[in-house]
Structure formats: structure tokens, C-alpha cells
């Protein structure tokens, strides 16, 4: 999704701006954690000030890719009611099967499902409207249709430039891109959906089931 929005001429994109704060606050030993902390902002108040300030480079749209679990409980949520929110979801089995390729022992709070539904409920209550929800499978099966619907939902004009982009990494990718974005860097468009053949390890089945309820709640609101 970041590639789609980042390829628009009118959009500036930012990649997981709370990641350095999250790693610094939790002490999580993620790959290249020291580099992420050194290159990023670790004060969540300053991060919010940046995200709610002027859009860089004179652009009209500020696309902010967030990970729900990076917004730890200490982070003030009120700023979220002043921005346009959209939620991207994915089947828990596919999330976990993908995650364990890089880190083999995630905990429930590492996967973001519980935080995602908490933030969704907060935003929905504050703005008195349901923010758009996209399911990753729907996006891959029909990217043009889903992105048209998303643009309509957030009040911007759809651009064909959202459907294809040059390969490679971007200046706006996080400092962790070399570790996490190898497959993304190869893409030039949305790849067709293919069910994951990877299996959820037996010791993570219980966590997977805990993720199912918030995922299915959000799935009810998805654009399709």
C-alpha cells in the first residue's frame, strides 16, 4: 500500500514513524534495532507533532504507514481523530506464517491485531464514523477496484499511478528496508493473490486463534 500511495505525484509517504520509539521503549531485539533507533525519533510527542504538522515537500497528501502495535499505551490517541484513518487487515494465519520467516517466536502483542481493533474502536467513537478497512486478499485480487473505493472513502481522486511503480527501495523506506523489504523491492505492481502454503507452527496456534476475533470484527467493515 505504501508503494501505491508513494507513487502518486501529490503524496509524501512516511514509513512506520513510531518504530524507533517502539524499539527504544520496549527493548525488543528486532533485526537492525540499533540502527533503527539511531536513525529515528524516539519521543512519541515529537513524532505526533511531525505527523500532524505541514506536509513535507509541498505535497497535498501525507500517507503515513503505521503498525498498530507501535502505538504503545503511553502514546496519546487524540491526534488520530484529526487525521484520516484507514485499516489494512490480513488473515492471522497468513500474518503469522509470514512473520515467522523473519522472527520465529512472536507474542500476541507483536502481531498488532488487538491494538488494531482498539485503535479502530477509538477512532470510530471519536469521529462518529466508520473508517475504511481493506483486506489484503481483496487488494491483491482486485487492486484497481479496491483502491478506487478507498480513494472515494477518503475523499481523494484515484490515480492510475497507484497501480504500478518502479522496482527497488525508496528514500522514504525505513532504515530496516534492507532486512524486511526484499520481496517488496522486486515488485512493480500488486502481485496476484496466492494462498500461503506456509503453516502456522503448532506452538503458535493458540495465538492465531486469539487474533481471529479482532480480525473478523474488522473484516465485517471491509471495502469490497
Where on the chain are the PLM-derived regions?
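Generic structural signal for helix capping and beta-alpha/helix-loop junctions
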Residues: 21-23, 95, 168
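Short N-terminal targeting/anchoring amphipathic segment
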Residues: 57-65
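A generic fold-level signal
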Residues: 56-58, 80-81
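A polyampholytic, Gly/Pro-enriched intrinsically disordered region
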Residues: 33-42, 107-111, 177-189
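Soluble or luminal CAZymes and related metallo-dependent hydrolases
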Residues: 39-46, 67-68, 108-115, 142, ...
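PAPS-dependent sulfotransferase catalytic core
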Residues: 1-57
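PAPS-dependent sulfotransferase catalytic domain
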Residues: 64-161, 175, 179-182
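PAPS-dependent sulfotransferases, especially Golgi type II membrane carbohydrate sulfotransferases
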Residues: 157-224
